[in-house]
């Protein structure tokens, strides 16, 4: 695995790893080392496998009270600065100048890589039939060869993630990439479940709604709007009842960051050793 990645299940309780302490590539925010480089470098970091997460403010605000989500972020191998709100608050509090690396920017770079586009190299975990149909149609228009066997329809997971059927499929097919497009807060826990229980380590990309902004499954977000930290506004305008309350509640992240800054909120037990394969541990 690329040395820029954090240590995953070998990390300390504050989510540090091989990249920790290097301010050229990481910042420790809320006790988690966030990668602050560019999209191409982030995708390169995942070449050897691992778990990538794209934490957004609506889920990050629960970091102090959602132990499962907190554990998933702690044990991720790469965390990117998708949350514009988190980046703005951090730069204000710390007089820093870190840049945002959005999930959309990461996905555009990832989807341009030949090894992701190779037939059979990627398993796509989709949130439901309607989303899957739109996403697959868009992928095929972009030149991806996606057959039905390449798509897994995620069930409605409970707080305790368990999906032995998915483990069996991945164990048999062994794709290099697993792209998870379900909702934030769930996808990270699913990614950690797979990382701990699969007999090999694929690159697990928890990209959430990023593909939906490209496929039309959700509102299209222009690249200029994404770069200007305005993606949330487009989502709110497209579906106010759904997204306005979500982003309004995300303001709680400000208080969390003022209180904890670079410290991990909540008590977290030491990392557990990966469980043997086959022993199990809301959609967007």
What feature does the model see in each segment?
Residues 1-8, 14-107:
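N-terminal nucleotide/polyanion-binding subdomain common to many enzyme families
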Residues 49, 119, 199-203:
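A short helix->loop->beta-strand "cap" motif at the edges of active sites that frequently abuts
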Residues 57-60, 85, 182-187, 210-211:
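Short glycine-rich anion-binding loops that position phosphate/pyrophosphate groups of nucleotides
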Residues 87-169, 173-174:
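Conserved beta-alpha
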Residues 87-88, 220-273:
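A transmembrane-helix-recognition feature enriched in membrane-embedded lipid enzymes
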Residues 136, 188-197:
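Short Gly/Thr/Asp-enriched flexible loops that form oxyanion-binding sites at enzyme active sites
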Residues 153-158, 201-238:
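Short, flexible loop segments at boundaries between secondary-structure elements
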Residues 170, 174-184:
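Proline-aspartate-enriched helix->loop->beta-strand connector
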